[in-house]
């Protein structure tokens, strides 16, 4: 049974304001048993022999485990993060078994002997080195680190390892960090608000804000400077929308259940672009 409809109800509402790992864990709780059964049978997730479903299950298991490692980097997972994680799981009506499975994967990443580099190299292998999927994985980890509003130096160190093993330079990571931090502020400042519909899912509704700080965050979210010309602005927008195009990501291996997640990310990008267009008078 697909449970992403449950995830969507809170996923992006908490993406930049709460415990991101909990939201993803809801989906992983559904997928984890598949990965565990395959691991117990001695299956090795390599691009050549694994089915797409198997690779997808491994992708999510690893994503949640690495999030646990990121969260633990600063010494302990904060009380606020735990409370938000529990609240998210309760709101999504997870079964006790699903909660245990999600928590098990997260705890695995928190262990001091968690094989971070090996796990990341495996992710790079099972994705076939596809840039968009690896970028998506990196963005998940950044979102986990920024969930409580601040990135601890130890979390930043772990993120540098994640980026390195996935094939991203330190400069690329720092740019992504700036973009995600801007997205956090953009959401907190009113760029995004969510409301529940029918009790089953949450639809993001973007709201425009014309304050100087919101505009600055919109530029940073797109990864461009405030003095960028219209051509540069449009090119940055097209590039980001192409990288986060739901259909393209699914075609490259992202589970179909996560298509709506990619759609929400695209909405975030579009909201920033629309604000800049309005302020600049771009047609």
Swiss-Prot record:
Residues 188-210 are annotated as: Disordered. Residues 188-197 have a biased composition (Gly residues). One of its GO terms (cellular component) is plasma membrane. It comes from the Bacteria. Keywords: Cell inner membrane, Cell membrane, Chaperone, Membrane, Transmembrane, Transmembrane helix. Disulfide bonds: none annotated. Residues 1-6 are periplasmic. InterPro entries: DjlA (IPR023749), DjlA_DnaK_co-chaperone (IPR050817), DjlA_N (IPR007791), DnaJ_domain (IPR001623), J_dom_sf (IPR036869), TerB-like (IPR029024). Residues 217-283 form the J domain. CDD domains: DnaJ, terB_like_DjlA. SMART domains: DnaJ. It is a single-pass type III membrane protein. Residues 198-210 have a biased composition (Low complexity). It holds the Pfam family TerB. GO terms for molecular function: protein-folding chaperone binding. PROSITE patterns: DNAJ_2. Homodimer. PANTHER family: CO-CHAPERONE PROTEIN DJLA. Regulatory DnaK co-chaperone. Direct interaction between DnaK and DjlA is needed for the induction of the wcaABCDE operon, involved in the synthesis of a colanic acid polysaccharide capsule, possibly through activation of the RcsB/RcsC phosphotransfer signaling pathway. The colanic acid capsule may help the bacterium survive conditions outside the host. This is Co-chaperone protein DjlA. It comes from Aliivibrio fischeri (strain ATCC 700601 / ES114). The gene is djlA.
């Amino acid at each position: 049974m697909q449970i992403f409809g449950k995830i969507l109800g809170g996923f992006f509402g908490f993406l930049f304001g709460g415990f991101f790992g909990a939201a993803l864990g809801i989906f992983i709780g559904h997928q984890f048993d598949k990965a565990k059964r395959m691991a117990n049978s001695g299956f090795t997730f390599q691009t050549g022999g694994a089915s797409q479903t198997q690779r997808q299950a491994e992708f999510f298991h690893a994503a949640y485990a690495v999030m646990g490692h990121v969260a633990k980097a600063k010494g302990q997972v904060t009380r606020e993060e735990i409370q938000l994680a529990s609240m998210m799981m309760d709101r999504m009506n997870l079964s006790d078994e699903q909660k245990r499975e999600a928590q098990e994967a997260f705890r695995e990443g928190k262990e001091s002997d968690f094989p971070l580099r090996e796990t990341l190299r495996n992710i790079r292998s099972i994705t076939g080195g596809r840039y968009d999927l690896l970028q998506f994985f990196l963005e998940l980890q950044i979102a986990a680190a920024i969930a409580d509003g601040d990135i601890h130096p130890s979390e930043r160190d772990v993120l540098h390892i994640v980026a390195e093993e996935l094939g991203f330079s330190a400069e690329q990571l720092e740019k992504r960090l700036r973009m995600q931090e801007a997205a956090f502020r953009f959401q907190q400042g009113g760029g995004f608000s969510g409301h529940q519909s029918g009790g089953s899912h949450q639809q993001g509704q973007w709201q425009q804000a014309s304050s100087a700080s919101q505009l600055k965050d919109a530029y940073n979210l797109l990864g461009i400077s405030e003095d960028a010309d219209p051509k540069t602005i449009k090119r940055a927008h097209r590039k980001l929308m192409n990288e986060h195009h739901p259909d393209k990501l699914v075609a490259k291996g992202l589970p179909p259940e996560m298509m709506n997640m990619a759609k929400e990310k695209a909405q975030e990008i579009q909201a920033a672009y629309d604000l800049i267009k309005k302020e600049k008078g771009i047609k």
